[in-house]
Amino acid sequence: ECEKELRPIGHPRCYKCGKPIETGEYCRDCQKHRHMYEQGRGIFVYDGIMRRSVTRYKYYGCREYGDFYARAMYRYAQKELREWKPDLIVPVPVHRSKERQRGFNQAAYLAEKLGHYTGISTDVNIVQKVLKTKSQKKLNALQRRKNLEKAFCVTGDVRGKNILVIDDVYTTGSTIDAMAGCLKRKGAGNVYFLTVCIGRR
């Protein structure tokens, strides 16, 4: 609806997570915390139009928004995709109960679309969310990390594979870190992420 107003995040941005920054190489969060993933980026800043857009996509089933998001990921992350050379695209899973409630897994929908555009293998079931956790929205960074301990389980062979994790929004990185840790414990190579949006802080 407001596609023309949207601008992807340009430079300077954090070398690790891709958050917009004013100077330097890393955002404050990546200076303070050692993340489990290698690198990643979000395409748009999570505010205003995009916050409303993602809410409609996630909670009201507006899948046409997902089509636009996946096209934007493919269009604006060409350089990263070439550099990262992922072998497999994997979405952040949601617990069964949440998927029933929403009617779909919004990250899995994005992953499948991106896989179609890129030709990269996609597996939406290889990581499962086995614990029903509290919503991350109202938790601080430490609580988010604790909340996700042992939440994910890898059900297939990821040994030696470079993995691209897909989600809708990156805030503190705790979800991506939990996913990356789980994948690496099962022998995955490098883990990267792409999200539709990323917070400023």
Question: Where are the language model's segments positioned?
Answer:
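Glycine-rich phosphate/pyrophosphate-handling loop used in enzymes and phosphotransfer proteins
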Residues: E1-D167, T171-R201
